[in-house]
Structures are given as C-alpha cells and as structure tokens.
A protein has these predicted regions:
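C-terminal extensions of enzymes
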Residues: 140-176
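Alpha/beta enzyme core
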Residues: 7-24, 31
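Active-site mouth loops of central-metabolism enzymes
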Residues: 1-7, 49
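Shared catalytic-loop signature of beta/alpha-barrel
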Residues: 21-24, 30-150
Length: 176
C-alpha cells in the first residue's frame, strides 16, 4: 500500500485480505503511525510487513517492540548496510519476527539482500522487483533467476558472488 492508506481503508482491505488468505499486507499506513500500525496488526490475521522506507535502528525497534509489524523489511541500501540491518534483524528475531529485506534497485543490492537474508535465522524472503530493470539484470554478468519463487546462491564465489558487466557500467558512467 506504500504507506498511503487511512486506518479505516487499511482495516477494510485487511479484512478482505484475511478472507483471501493473502500472505502479507505491506506498509498499509504511514511509517510514523505507530499506534495505527499496532492496532491494525492486532486486528488482522494477515501479517503486516514494513517499513522499507525506515532508515533508523531506533525507529525499527519501535515498530518491532510496539508490534506494529509482523515482518520487518529493511532496505540494506537505505538502513545502514549489513551491520545496521543485522541489528534490526536481531531485534526482530528477539521478538519472534521474520526479516524480509527490500531490494528494488540494482543487481548489486539484490545480491547483497539475498546473501543477507540467507545468513539470518529469521530471514523469510527478499522482496524483489520482477519488472525489467537494466541496472538489476544487465549489470550482472550472470543475473539471478527466480525459479518457483526461489533464487539459488552460488557458495563457490567470493563476496556477493557476482561479477559486474563493465560494458553496462560504461554505458551509465557519468564523469564529474
């Protein structure tokens, strides 16, 4: 819902989602609507996921400890990288919540998010965009492929397990 719905609209939609057995209801309310998010999460069976736009550990902790979400979705590129996101995931794990990183930009972020999630005991999934994106698929010499909802990681390669296509980097290069 992209943090754009009113509480009443989110509740109404959430009850329909409950009947349809929808897996997640992502970011129904504003990120800073802690009371509304907690009440919504309490009143629905559909799990509330969020908030990819949040960037601070302290605010994620407030969302988690206040039971405003059921699934935490930090974006590694926005929320402080691996180190800060591991702290966020640890707070979520301490509250028996899953972590599902958000990865909607380049192939590098997707690789980082996949490896990050794979290394978590409470890693649920990675939210990734399946639309065409030259910086996601084209940037990698060997793009990730989802098969039946899963992406297999190659543990024989170092680091993030990716190699960048220099011709694509050249295409987007800007001299400053």
């Amino acid at each position: 819902a992209n943090a754009a719905w009113s509480f009443s609209d989110a509740l109404r939609a959430g009850k329909i989602f409950d009947d349809l057995n929808i897996y997640l209801f992502e970011e129904p309310l504003r990120t800073d609507d802690y009371a509304g998010s907690a009440e919504l999460a309490n009143r629905l069976n559909t799990r509330i996921a969020g908030y990819e736009t949040e960037v601070l550990l302290t605010n994620f902790a407030r969302l988690i400890e206040g039971r405003c979400v059921d699934v935490v979705q930090p974006d590694i590129s926005w929320a402080g990288g691996f180190t800060e996101c591991r702290k966020i995931a640890a707070v979520a794990e301490a509250h028996c919540m899953e972590t599902a990183p958000h990865a909607f930009s380049s192939g590098i972020l997707l690789a980082a998010s996949l490896h990050f999630s794979a290394g978590l005991s409470n890693g649920a999934m990675v939210e990734l965009d399946m639309t065409e994106n030259g910086l996601r698929a084209g940037l990698l010499k060997e793009p990730f492929k989802a098969v039946n909802g899963y992406v297999e990681l190659d543990d024989t390669k170092y680091g993030l397990g990716i190699e960048l296509d220099e011709s694509v980097i050249e295409k987007y290069r800007v001299e400053l």
